[in-house]
Curated annotation (Swiss-Prot):
It comes from Thermoproteus tenax virus 1 (strain KRA1) (TTV1). This is Uncharacterized 38.6 kDa protein.
Length: 352
């Protein structure tokens, strides 16, 4: 998944960075990193509603990291205008699309907007107006933010902006004002840095973000809580699946950590580690092949995800025995996998 930092305010002194008002962050190891590396470049195109293409730039891909753009409307945008931003590769293949808005600088000034209120890089607030079209609920924004941050959140359906403090129950509100379904997973960390755990959870976060929003809270030096909010009444088994995926991914991080430290692992742990790595590679290849198709691309990608999750679920089911396999595990979890998920579900449901 790509992360956009953007306030999309044009023709005014309101920028995310001194030299950019739109930036794209491409994480290492993501499927986009794989695709862009294979293609060598990508095109960023912005289409304004009722106007047409107002910005297009070809980017030579040099690897994961931040790519910045200075977008100007050339004076043709005089009011808040819905836009579509496309990421294009190859023969005009759109692989990423999201909806957003552009605000003219003078109107932004009268609205009282200031630098870094719409997006706040450096403190971990990523506001993404939409996400890959092949993921879930493409009409809602995704928010990945630290608990306690107060910022300006953008709603793309009715072009409403609202200042809000991020909390486990206030990460994202549906248009009707109701708090979406929320679930949490608390992990106790032993001999590990919380930021390392966030990195280990990146893929699980991306998976969950496709269904809603994700936030995290570091409550102490050795504990981190992830909050996953779904914007539709998702059944409990889907929630359980997401957590199983997360645990499987984190288990793989344990494997890597153990191997790095030279701690002996038995054959079972090594086999699961190999299976995880092979599954990740197969998923990337599957997604890449889907992009080469001229039809049926959405179904192809859905099938890739289904197979990917199926294997991760199997790995997650073996996580309980895995903890016993590893001597002095680097990470420990509060409760058994299934019990923890069901308990969180019941607790949050009661609070609603």
């Amino acid at each position: 998944m790509m992360l956009f930092f953007t306030n999309m305010i044009v023709d005014g002194n309101y920028t995310v960075y001194e030299d950019a008002n739109l930036a794209i962050y491409i994480p290492p190891g993501s499927d986009f990193d794989y695709i862009f590396t294979k293609n060598g470049q990508f095109i960023l195109q912005i289409i304004a509603q009722g106007i047409g293409v107002i910005f297009q730039q070809t980017v030579n891909y040099t690897g994961p990291g931040l790519y910045k753009f200075q977008v100007s409307s050339g004076g043709v945008i005089t009011q808040i205008t819905p836009i579509t931003i496309d990421i294009i590769i190859g023969n005009n293949i759109v692989i990423y699309e999201f909806q957003g808005i552009i605000i003219p600088g003078d109107q932004a000034s009268t609205m009282g907007l200031t630098v870094n209120e719409v997006s706040y890089p450096g403190q971990g607030l990523f506001i993404v107006q939409g996400y890959p079209w092949y993921m879930y609920n493409p009409n809602y924004p995704v928010v990945f933010a630290p608990i306690g941050y107060t910022g300006l959140f953008m709603g793309i359906d009715n072009v409403v902006m609202e200042r809000r403090t991020v909390s486990p129950t206030n990460m994202f509100l549906q248009p009707d004002g109701k708090v979406p379904y929320a679930y949490q997973l608390t992990i106790t960390i032993q001999n590990a840095n919380a930021q390392q755990i966030i990195q280990a959870f990146n893929q699980a976060i991306e998976f969950a973000a496709g269904m809603g929003a994700v936030a995290y809270e570091i409550t102490s030096n050795n504990q981190i809580t992830f909050y996953i909010i779904f914007i539709s009444p998702t059944s409990w088994w889907v929630v359980a699946l997401v957590f199983v995926v997360a645990l499987a991914l984190l288990a793989a991080a344990v494997f890597v950590d153990k191997l790095t430290k030279g701690v002996a692992m038995d054959m079972q742990a090594q086999a699961i580690s190999n299976a995880y790595n092979a599954n990740t590679q197969a998923f990337q290849q599957c997604i890449s092949s889907c992009y080469q198709q001229t039809s049926g691309r959405t179904q192809c990608i859905n099938n890739c995800y289904a197979n990917y999750v199926k294997v991760l679920t199997m790995l997650g089911a073996q996580f309980g025995s895995l903890n016993q396999v590893l001597s002095q595990p680097t990470l420990s979890f509060s409760g058994q996998t299934n019990v923890s998920v069901q308990t969180n579900w019941a607790t949050v449901a009661a609070l609603r």
